[in-house]
Regions:
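Active-site PLP-lysine loop of aminotransferase-like
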Residues: 1-11, 96
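Predominant activation on well-ordered alpha-helical scaffold segments within soluble catalytic domains
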Residues: 14-25, 46, 50, 83, ...
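Conserved C-terminal alpha-helix-loop-beta "cap" of PLP-dependent enzymes
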Residues: 70-121
Length: 149
């Protein structure tokens, strides 16, 4: 048939549609609790990093952001070495999920220098993240920062 103006012909698989609807229902029911959990762990990560390290700048608003991410600039270190050392120890990124390895144009637009943008890191918290993960991340990041300064 020519359903969907010829874009998606064929009958929709009803079991998949029902399953998708149930998944959405569960996600919506858990959305508030999940956001609170992510925010709790993100704030613990930030507090631990700020407590143990000087020269950290928060990129973007800490209030107006999704609860699962944190983007920081680490001053006074070589960004390339920083990322290389972290690569084997912690899952993190130097930019957005769609970046091409270049310094973030968003960080540059926020007023970060090229050097600051190159020594920035994006950390994400997942639903499976726990307190042990946060403590380990703080430990790894702190030791890596101290080794490069």
């Amino acid at each position: 048939g020519g359903q969907e103006y010829g874009l998606r012909s064929g009958t929709l698989p009803l079991p998949l549609v029902v399953g998708f609807a149930k998944a959405i229902e569960i996600a919506v029911l858990n959305q508030k609790n999940n956001a609170e959990k992510l925010l709790f762990y993100r704030n613990n990560l930030l507090e631990g990093l700020l407590k143990n390290n000087s020269g950290l700048l928060i990129n973007g608003s800490i209030e107006k952001r999704l609860p699962h991410n944190l983007n920081l600039t680490v001053l006074d270190l070589n960004g390339a070495k920083f990322h290389k050392l972290l690569k084997s120890k912690i899952i993190c990124s130097t930019g957005s999920a769609c970046s091409n390895g270049e310094p973030s144009h968003v960080l540059l637009a926020l007023g970060r220098s090229l050097k600051e943008a190159e020594s920035s890191i994006r950390l994400s918290i997942g639903l499976s993240t726990n307190s042990k993960d946060i403590k380990q991340a703080i430990h790894i990041l702190t030791n890596t920062i101290k080794s490069l300064r």
